[in-house]
Structure formats: structure tokens, C-alpha cells
């Protein structure tokens, strides 16, 4: 109760930062002491941290205010929450008794995936806000988001093959790769609308459209990754079905 109510005296994103730190600290204390209450409390506080973080997003990014690039409380708080969630996942992996606990629990792989989601959202919200507020062009934020999305997926899938603590199941790699490709294809009409707006109303922003061609190259890399994942992990029947779906897309 004290752990949940103490940070209420703080303001805004400081509550989220406090709960993120406290969740990691309490789980670490549980591993050292074996006190089950610390373990359960850490997980509950982590969930409340996510709720608080969502409220921070609404308050910060819906205000319409011009925020400093990178050095703003929205991005910093989200990155901190992602880091705390990742460290919590590492602690859960060290918990040899974790599989034997029948009560409420959050697995390490779920924490790891949520940490990656938070990391992704941190960049996506920052890019969307900065380009929406600072530039008058409609869909320019979408253009840069569609550069960020495939770049993020490529980097994460590459790191997951190099760093043991970042290893992801192939199903997750397949899902995020396919989702990234589909999101790009879905946004193609926005690219044409932006191109028309730039040519007719703002030719000084023509250089921005170079980002679109870079995005196309990254999406081509994702297509290659998707094919490699399917070949490595799907049987012949599923592979044929997947091939038809890919070409249909």
C-alpha cells in the first residue's frame, strides 16, 4: 500500500519514473530475500507504472505544445519505462522458482516483448509529435514514421540474433516483420497525397520525400527477412500458403 501511495505526492511523469524504479528494486530484493510479497508487489507496481505511463502520453502528446527534440519528459519517461521493464525481464529469468509459482505472474518473455513495444512507442510518439507540430505539411509525420518502423524492426531482429538476452521467438519476428510491411503498404496513399501537396504548395520541402525511397529499400530488406523466416521455420504446406499470401500482399 505504501509503495503504491507514496509517489502520489509527486507530479506527472515523476510518478511513472518512481514506480518503474521501484518495481525493479522490489523484484531484486525478492531474489535476494525470497519474500514472496516483494515479488507480487513488484508485479502490481509494474502494471500501475504502465497505466501511469499511458496517462503521461495523453497529457504530454495531446497538449499540442512544442517539445524539445529528444530531451523531453515524454521520450525520456518512456525510454526509462522500457529499460526498467527489460531489467525486470532479466530478473524474472534469474528466478528459478518462477515457474513453480501458482499465483499471478508475468513471464520473462512477456516482459521482454512489452519492453520492446515501449521502446518502439517511445520513438514513434516522438517522431509523430515533432513532425506534426513543427511542419505544416499533412502526412509528413507518416512519411518519417514509415522510415522509423522498418528501421526499428530490422535493428531489433538483427540484435536478437547477436545478443543472448534479446533473443525473440521466430513467431514474434515473423509477426513484427509482416506487420511492418503491411503498415507501409497501408500508408502508400498518404505518400501520394504528401507528394502532391509538396509539389503544389511547398516545393521547399521536396528533399523530405527522399525518405520515402529509403523506406522502400528497408521494406525490401524486410521482405527478404520474411521469406528467410518462413523458409527456416514453416513446413512445406505452410510455406506454400505463406508464399501465396506474401505475393498476394
Go through each PLM region and give its residues.
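Alpha-helical transmembrane segments of multi-pass membrane proteins
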Residues: 1-249
Amino acid at each position: 500500500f505504501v509503495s503504491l501511495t507514496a509517489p502520489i505526492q509527486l507530479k506527472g511523469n515523476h510518478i511513472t519514473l518512481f514506480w518503474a524504479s521501484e518495481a525493479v528494486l522490489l523484484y531484486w530484493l525478492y531474489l535476494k530475500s525470497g519474500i514472496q510479497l516483494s515479488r507480487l508487489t513488484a508485479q502490481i507496481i509494474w502494471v500501475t507504472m504502465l497505466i501511469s505511463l499511458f496517462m503521461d502520453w495523453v497529457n504530454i502528446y495531446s497538449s499540442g505544445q512544442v517539445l524539445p527534440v529528444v530531451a523531453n519528459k515524454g521520450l525520456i519517461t518512456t525510454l526509462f519505462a522500457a529499460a526498467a521493464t527489460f531489467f525486470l525481464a532479466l530478473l524474472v529469468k534469474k528466478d528459478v522458482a518462477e515457474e513453480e509459482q501458482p499465483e499471478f505472474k508475468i513471464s520473462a518473455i512477456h516482459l521482454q516483448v512489452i519492453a520492446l513495444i515501449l521502446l518502439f512507442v517511445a520513438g514513434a510518439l516522438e517522431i509523430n509529435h515533432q513532425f506534426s507540430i513543427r511542419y505544416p505539411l499533412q502526412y509528413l509525420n507518416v512519411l518519417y514514421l514509415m522510415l522509423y518502423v522498418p528501421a526499428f524492426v530490422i535493428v531489433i531482429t538483427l540484435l536478437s540474433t547477436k545478443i543472448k538476452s534479446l533473443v525473440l521467438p521466430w513467431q514474434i519476428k515473423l509477426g513484427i516483420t509482416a506487420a511492418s510491411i503491411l503498415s507501409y503498404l497501408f500508408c502508400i496513399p498518404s505518400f501520394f497525397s504528401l507528394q502532391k501537396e509538396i509539389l503544389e504548395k511547398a516545393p521547399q520541402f521536396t528533399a523530405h520525400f527522399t525518405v520515402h525511397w529509403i523506406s522502400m529499400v528497408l521494406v525490401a530488406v524486410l521482405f527478404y527477412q520474411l521469406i528467410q523466416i518462413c523458409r527456416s521455420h514453416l513446413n512445406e504446406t505452410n510455406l506454400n500458403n505463406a508464399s501465396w499470401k506474401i505475393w498476394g500482399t
